[in-house]
Amino acid sequence: MDTIASLFSFITIPVSWVIVQFHSVYGKVFGADTGWAWGLSIVSLVILIRICLIPLFVKQIKATRAMQTLQPEMKKIQERYKNDKQRQSEEMMKLYKESGTNPLSSCLPILAQSPFFFALYHVLNGIATGKTIGVIDDQLLASARKAHIFGAPLAAKFTDSADKVTQLGATLMDVRVVTAIMIVLMSASQFYTQRQLMTKNVDTTVKTPFMQQQKMLMYVFPVMFAIFGINFPVGVLVYWLTTNVWTMGQQMYVIRNNPTPGSKAQAAFLERLQKHVLHHGKTRSRGQRAVVKAIVAKGRDRNEFERKFINALTKAGLAAQSDGTIGKGEATAVAETEDGTQTTGGAPRRQQPKRQSKSQRQSGSAKAAGESEPKSTPLSLSKSDEPDDAKPAAKPAGGANKPSTGTRSKAQSGQRKGPQRPKSPSKK
């Protein structure tokens, strides 16, 4: 761990400078040598970093949802080219390019936090060994070594020896108890975040491998925290716990205000939006207008919850406009049936004729032919009443009963025209 932390030593000075600045503020309130001053400085560092990472978090949400949408297509490509890995990779890259999706975008917040995480570990490890690091001088080093949170030094670790912990002014039991409590809290917060994501913010209409991956991570992360947590100082665990709590709150906000389409969270969100629109007759904020605009733009591709929302507005005499606003009047209202067919202005849906089978079509054509036969009788009678001069000349006598020569005239119904092949004699 020390080797990995040394790779991010270039960011140690900025991280230590930020901690010292926050410590100078909290030290005036709680005292310079207290664990609250140093602990809150670490918490403030986390908050500052996470605020700066909000744009990356938004990009992560979009990338994650795009990957969820592409999972069925990715599975088809994997099955189609399962014996050709190179072609499979080419088709995957082509799919990402066409959809404008980058698989690494969902990892950006974690990758961006890693340098700060290991830089903080480098700073606290220097405090534990009594070395000045970054902008932390001897005076600040002595103050940080005296800082305890719930009886455990911020620079102490679960795996430290009893003598090393005693030099920091604490007992090994205190360090291990505080470390265990923090690991449990970290695991619980991460488990709750993943469970909320799995149960409320996943499209229930699509079963993808992504859901299985999320379910696996829900149980893997607590085990990882237990394994790696005992090797980190208490101050780093404070950083880690604060990050998990921030992520949990951020995820709850996203689930409530920007849920995944087709999820249970979207059903609850549209129900709240429907009550507000029916009560006030309009959308309240830019975010609500963006949601309504996206629903209108989907057309027949709307899911079940979105169709219910549009139909509820139509029944109330309201109409969702293409710009996300809500207007009145049935002329522009858009309603949808359960299969996604749109109807405008509450007009009844035209019934489509049922498709007939082949036997039904044949019986219908035979019946129509039978009804048309009596109609041809008057025509034949009228032809017989024509004058004699209008009739064609009769054939000469003797030629009426004379059969015509040629093989074509001898062909009867059921026979093949042309020279007939003699039958072979039967063998007895």
UniProtKB/Swiss-Prot annotation:
Start-end of Basic residues biased regions: 418-428
Keywords, ordered alphabetically: Cell membrane, Chaperone, Membrane, Protein transport, Transmembrane, Transmembrane helix, Transport
Compartments where found: Cell membrane
Bilayer-spanning residue ranges: 3-23, 38-58, 220-240
Gene Ontology biological process: protein insertion into membrane; protein transport
Pfam families on file: 60KD_IMP
Bias (Polar residues) ranges: 402-415
Cellular-component GO terms for this entry: plasma membrane
Sequence ranges of Basic and acidic residues compositional bias: 383-392
Compositionally skewed regions (Low complexity) per UniProt: 359-369
Membrane topology reported for the UniProt record: Multi-pass membrane protein
Region described as Disordered: spans on this chain: 330-428
Statement: the UniProt record of this protein carries the keyword Chloroplast: no
GO molecular function (one): membrane insertase activity
InterPro entries tied to this protein: YidC/ALB3/OXA1/COX18 (IPR001708), YidC/Oxa/ALB_C (IPR028055), YidC_ALB_C (IPR047196)
Tagged with keyword Transcription: no
Family per similarity comment: Belongs to the OXA1/ALB3/YidC family. Type 1 subfamily.
Function of the molecule: Required for the insertion and/or proper folding and/or complex formation of integral membrane proteins into the membrane. Involved in integration of membrane proteins that insert both dependently and independently of the Sec translocase complex, as well as at least some lipoproteins. Aids folding of multispanning membrane proteins.
PANTHER family named in the record: CYTOCHROME C OXIDASE ASSEMBLY PROTEIN COX18, MITOCHONDRIAL, OXA1
Subunit structure: Interacts with the Sec translocase complex via SecD. Specifically interacts with transmembrane segments of nascent integral membrane proteins during membrane integration.
This protein's name: Membrane protein insertase YidC
Source organism per UniProt: Streptomyces avermitilis (strain ATCC 31267 / DSM 46492 / JCM 5070 / NBRC 14893 / NCIMB 12804 / NRRL 8165 / MA-4680)
